[in-house]
Amino acid sequence: MSTLPISSVSFSSSTSPLVVDDKVSTKPDVIRHTMNFNASIWGDQFLTYDEPEDLVMKKQLVEELKEEVKKELITIKGSNEPMQHVKLIELIDAVQRLGIAYHFEEEIEEALQHIHVTYGEQWVDKENLQSISLWFRLLRQQGFNVSSGVFKDFMDEKGKFKESLCNDAQGILALYEAAFMRVEDETILDNALEFTKVHLDIIAKDPSCDSSLRTQIHQALKQPLRRRLARIEALHYMPIYQQETSHNEDLLKLAKLDFSVLQSMHKKELSHICKWWKDLDLQNKLPYVRDRVVEGYFWILSIYYEPQHARTRMFLMKTCMWLVVLDDTFDNYGTYEELEIFTQAVERWSISCLDMLPEYMKLIYQELVNLHVEMEESLGKGGKNISNSLCQGRWQKELGSQITLVETKMAKRGVHAQPLEEYMSVSMVTGTYGLMIARSYVGRGDIVTEDTFKWVSSYPPIIKASCVIVRLMDDIVSHKEEQERGHVASSIECYSKESGASEEEACEYISRKVEDAWKVINRESLRPTAVPFPLLMPAINLARMCEVLYSVNDGFTHAEGDMKSYMKSFFVHPMVV
């Protein structure tokens, strides 16, 4: 991004004086509690991008195969044969798991709507545990509120799932996946989850278990489908689907070609963003900041990976990286006095604040303004009504002020644990996850209105639940490291102090809170929804991202294991078609 002169920006006027300690910028021997982060593991390998020679041909093949799959979806949906509808949900499941559902959103919606209207609560293959579980999961995922009472036929007179079901491995696996669509007080699905976990573990350990099934069980126990990112599931599922004797060759070929085409697009975007980041020269100007631009782009792809969201993806990416800068500044470098001034400057958003800031903060402040201007100019060129598209702008500034102000106050209080409820109310502001979800709507002119931004700025339950999941999963894996570097107490320490629980007990309690938050997400995804269904996906995908990012440790700061492997699959290793 080119540097825009800050004097060219139209600022709001403010008559309130900025309270400044004249000695802030000149204090000698300022003590800074910095932490030395590891350098980027990627170096400069993504700065350049070479377009594959066969990219145009692949795009043409994708378009041809899309038409074939679309015809099949429409044809099967139009059949009057009930068992063809069983085949239809299996096809939809494969399309979704192969990562190509975004090509067929209308066809999938119409097909599942037709199935819901046609069968209601009486699925045609209701005695088949695998089939009814798949039917239930797909309809719930699409927002149709089918009752979990459909599983009562698989329970005994005591209300427990029949032990005879353990002989149906595929059915047990399908029921397990369906159970993750549960909402609050849905005892049947709670019991289903407990029952299937036990039996899947036994099945996977059986030497006679099919290797493909064992792989699927291990993946499911590690991360259920409801919480899997689409692109990662596509990587997992393609080899499994290919082994199925009844697989659709056109569908498989489309999935591989589409993954390859998107991979090229993403690598090109990553090259652009790496150049932008390198040109900022923050490694020299702000050496305390984590150099995690590749990890940041992976993070953003979890929210939007589709081609039509390229512009929004770039807005999100730059927002993400500047939030990393702010996070490291508040957690790892700035003094209390500096942070207080910066808080006031962000709140006023006025040019008069610039001279009051320390030199390193002037850079941050100016670049935040530049990003805002860049977004305005880009949206203006696109013919969008900026007053609607950025109606949350004032809210973002207010939220930014709250973030910095609360972080500052917490830093001044030190690392002492406060009540968990207080910690959660504060961390929902300081985490900035709600801001990222709001920014995910900027640049989307399709179904986004001024009411959309009013809705997201009200912090509705699905946004809160998504933010809770991110915050708590981060705490579970990183609280020890945070304490070692003198960070504020996490939810683990807060609950331990409040309840007298051990660290292990606290982690178990916080994990249950994560499960409760997922139930809220599932409930808020059922129709009728507060906003169009596609606008719920950024909140859902943000929560899904945590299942990858915080599966073992803080995968953003320490990209190791699965996290590193996934990024290599996305950006380094070409898809073999």
Swiss-Prot record:
Residue positions annotated to bind Mg(2+) 1 are D327, D331
Could you tell me where this protein is found in the cell? Cytoplasm
Is Lyase tagged as a keyword?
Answer: yes
**GO biological process, any:** diterpenoid biosynthetic process
Where along the chain is Mg(2+) 2 bound?
D327, D331
User: In what tissue types does this protein appear?
Assistant: Expressed in flowers.
Q: What GO cellular-component annotations does this UniProt entry give?
A: cytoplasm
List required co-factors: Mg(2+); Co(2+); Mn(2+)
EC number(s): the record gives 4.2.3.47
Per UniProt, which keywords does this protein have?
A: Cobalt, Cytoplasm, Lyase, Magnesium, Manganese, Metal-binding
**How does activity shift as pH rises or falls?**
Optimum pH is 6.5-7.5.
Q: Name one GO molecular function term.
A: magnesium ion binding
**Intervals of motif DDXXD motif:** 327-331
Activity regulation (record text): Strongly inhibited by manganese at concentration higher than 20 uM.
Q: Which reaction does it catalyse?
A: (2E,6E)-farnesyl diphosphate = (E)-beta-farnesene + diphosphate
- Pathway entry: Secondary metabolite biosynthesis; terpenoid biosynthesis
Coiled-coil ranges per UniProt:
none
Cross-referenced SUPFAM superfamilies, in alphabetical order?
Answer: Terpenoid cyclases/Protein prenyltransferases, Terpenoid synthases
The protein's matches in InterPro entries, at most eight in alphabetical order, are given as:
Isoprenoid_synthase_dom_sf, Terpene_cyclase-like_1_C, Terpene_cyclase_plant_C1, Terpene_synth_N, Terpene_synth_N_sf, Terpene_synthase-like, Terpene_synthase_metal-bd, Terpenoid_cyclase/PrenylTrfase
Chain residues that bind Mg(2+) 3: D474, S478, E482
Q: Which Pfam families match?
A: Terpene_synth (PF01397), Terpene_synth_C (PF03936)
Note what the entry says on domains: The Asp-Asp-Xaa-Xaa-Asp/Glu (DDXXD/E) motif is important for the catalytic activity, presumably through binding to Mg(2+).
The text of the family note is:
Belongs to the terpene synthase family.
The role this protein plays is:
Sesquiterpene cyclase catalyzing the production of beta-farnesene from farnesyl diphosphate. Unable to use geranyl diphosphate as substrate.
**Family matches, as PANTHER family:** OS04G0344100 PROTEIN-RELATED, TERPENOID CYCLASES_PROTEIN PRENYLTRANSFERASE ALPHA-ALPHA TOROID-RELATED
What name goes with this protein?
Answer: (E)-beta-farnesene synthase
Natural source organism: Artemisia annua
